Regions:
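Alpha-helical transmembrane bundle of multi-pass membrane proteins
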Residues: 1-218, 223-227, 245-465
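Short, well-structured alpha-helical segments
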Residues: 231-245
Length: 465
């Protein structure tokens, strides 16, 4: 494909618009870490209720993922993203004004459903509107947006906590939300990007590949003409999709069992769920608690540092993912994750005996975040969005996403128990060990997809027995 024929500005605009869903995903997921203590105190929560508060959004995410693929295959990628924007908005406003803990849980679950839907549909949309030369970088915009959402949540938590301790408002409602019960403001601030995402969706088209699959080639051609300056490139994309569809039947479970395609589905599930057991979500949900146990005096500020490293590293990963390739990033990054996890375990095991500085742990903690952000975090959504055939992409991504969120929920619930029963040192050793099967699957089963079109990747899997 001729690079000069691609209208990169327009493609980037579409990718950026869809990636805003990732920012909401990141904010909604990370904001919880700064509100746990306040909500626990506000509603006098038991340990069980506290775990439910942390996990309820993950339950919503699992529900959202379960139908996201079928929904997006049935009504389109764009309407599915509209639904997620509405759910995020309702959740944010509801959390800010909720009268009881039960309603807070319900609103958090509503936001979780939005996370589940957008986590599947947004990277899928970006993958389908991108061209092969730039697809890795474009889909990585989604991961970058997630990390920006993480950082935004950490900053909002840190700043609003400072505001609540030094300011007062004449308005009783503002006083309640931003001072007296500042957790409401932390959760409610998500309303702003949620509404912006909703409005922006009016100004992007439907996925042209989805339109071709739905026998709307004329409409797809009209959209693709905005992507390319040469008509032959438009015709080539439409022809490729139609050619692959010619030998396929309507999307159903039987098609997922086809030789090669079933292998892709199983591999996708494995990398999705294993990635959650390599420590990243323990850092995300329980970072402040881990920092506090390690002796840090300002754990929320340390979490801001985590967000900054995560965000900056994702920008680096985005710039090199199509040049270096997906698999090399995984090999180098996961190797660094193993080293840093073992060093963190070493700190917790021997800090008293050797009088180790807390900054020893913090430095390897941040190195772990760097390695994770440049490898599995940057690559996983790219791979899941590009490794399945057009006709089953939505369903297959839902299955992988479902596995991912099941893993996320399990890690979220098990981490407090692991930190107590296995000790922090044992917990981080466990995370390091779980990196090994991930590396093996990446080496043994997954092709290097950088530079390959979606249709070429599809042919790789269908030829694999």
């Amino acid at each position: 494909m001729n690079d000069s024929s691609v209208k990169l500005g327009y493609v980037f605009y579409l990718a950026l618009a869809a990636a805003l869903g990732g920012l909401l995903f990141g904010y909604d997921t990370a904001v919880i870490s700064g509100t746990i203590d306040q909500v626990t105190s506000q509603f006098s929560l038991s340990v069980l209720q506290q775990g439910w508060y942390v996990g309820c959004a993950l339950i919503g995410s699992i529900i959202g993922v379960a139908f996201a693929g079928w929904l997006s295959d049935g009504i389109g990628r764009k309407p599915a993203m509209f639904l997620s924007a509405i759910l995020f908005t309702v959740s944010a406003i509801g959390c800010a004004i909720t009268p009881t803990f039960d309603w807070l849980v319900i609103y958090r679950m509503v936001g979780g459903v939005g996370i589940g839907v957008v986590s599947i549909v947004a990277p899928m949309y970006i993958s389908e509107v991108s061209v092969s030369q730039y697809r890795g970088r474009m889909v990585s915009l989604y991961q970058l947006a997630i990390t920006v959402g993480f950082l935004a949540a950490y900053l909002v938590n840190f700043l609003l906590l400072g505001v609540s301790q030094s300011h007062s408002f004449a308005s009783s409602q503002f006083q309640l939300i931003f001072v007296d019960e500042v957790w409401r403001g932390m959760l409610g601030m998500e309303t702003i990007p949620a509404l912006f995402f909703f409005i922006l969706l009016f100004f992007i088209p439907e996925s042209p590949r989805w339109l071709v699959v739905r026998n709307k080639s004329a409409q797809a051609t009209s959209i693709l003409e905005k992507f390319f300056s040469e008509k032959k490139e438009v015709d080539a994309v439409v022809s490729q999709v139609q050619s692959n569809l010619a030998s396929q039947v309507k999307t159903d479970w039987h098609q997922l069992l086809r030789p090669g395609i079933f292998t892709a589905v199983v591999v996708g599930v494995c990398i999705a769920i294993l990635g959650q057991f390599m420590g990243v979500n323990a850092v995300l949900y329980y970072g402040p608690s881990i920092f506090k146990d390690a002796g840090m005096t300002d754990p929320l500020f340390c979490q801001v540092l985590v967000g900054i490293v995560n965000c900056v590293t994702t920008i680096l990963a985005m710039s090199i993912i199509d040049k270096v390739g997906r698999k090399k990033l995984i090999y180098y990054g996961v190797s660094g994750m193993i080293l840093s996890l073992l060093m963190i375990a070493f700190y917790f095991a021997f800090t008293e005996a050797l009088n180790l500085s807390v900054y020893f742990m913090l430095s390897f903690f941040l190195f772990y975040v760097f390695c994770c952000a440049i490898s599995i975090s940057a690559v996983v959504w790219v791979l899941l969005s590009e490794m399945y055939p057009n006709s089953v992409r939505g369903v297959a991504m839902s299955i992988a996403g479902f596995a991912l969120w099941i893993g996320t929920y399990l890690v979220g619930q098990l981490t407090p128990w692991m930190l107590t029963s296995l000790t922090p040192a044992g917990t981080f050793i466990f995370f390091a060990i779980m990196c090994l099967p991930y590396m093996f699957i990446m080496w043994k089963y997954i092709p290097e997809t950088a530079g390959m079109s979606l249709e070429e990747i599809e042919r790789y899997w269908t030829k694999r027995k």
